[in-house]
Amino acid sequence: MFGCLVAGRLVQAAPQQVAEDKFVFDLPDYENINHVVVFMLGTVPFPEGMGGSVYFCYPDQSGMAVWQLLGFVTNEKPSAIFKISGLKSGKGSQHPFGAMNLPQTPTVAQIGISVELLENLVQQTPVANAAVSSVDSFTEFTQKMLDNFYNFASSFAVTQAQMTPNPSEAFIPANVVLKWYENFQRRLTQNPLFWKT
């Protein structure tokens, strides 16, 4: 039903089932892992109205399990990338794995998936900094930056009659800035990563 992927390692497609609705993947040598991908294999969908909350578990200094909510996967969102590199020293959160006696090894962390009602999933708050930036947030930032630049540059616009001659200053016509702004917006809409080419 689930898979787990860490860059440079083989895909894990057979989690340990620790309860009817709970699954765990071991992450050996977790200190050297920055991101983890959790995904549905596409063979068995979630039952109607269900999804899977995804947790990261690592042993603290005393060897006790610290669980942190990363996010969730659903039939509509069957995969997610999580950044775990900054979470290895944070506080734990409420989790459904509490009563289970899962073995803890100092160098092995775990990814836990708990099958739950969708209405419960959307009410949970993942630990900060677990989500990887998406194209949507980048696109939103770029759009706000464009708007801010255009508004700033436009606030200095003057008519030719209002210009004071100054041979040491260059002037850019406002229609050139507007043309650039519209062109950049169009390209961003077509391909948010166009600037990489």
Swiss-Prot record:
Transmembrane region(s): none
Domain of life: Eukaryota
GO terms for MF: Hsp70 protein binding; nuclear import signal receptor activity
UniProtKB keywords: Cytoplasm, Nucleus, Protein transport, Transport
GO BP annotation list: cellular response to heat; protein import into nucleus; protein transport
Gene Ontology, cellular component aspect: cytosol; nuclear speck; nucleus
KW Glycosyltransferase (keyword) present: no
Protein's cellular compartments: Cytoplasm, Cytosol; Nucleus
The family this protein is said to belong to: Belongs to the OPI10 family.
Role of this protein: Acts as a specific nuclear import carrier for HSP70 proteins following heat-shock stress: acts by mediating the nucleoporin-dependent translocation of ATP-bound HSP70 proteins into the nucleus. HSP70 proteins import is required to protect cells from heat shock damages.
Protein name in UniProt: Protein Hikeshi
Gene: HIKESHI
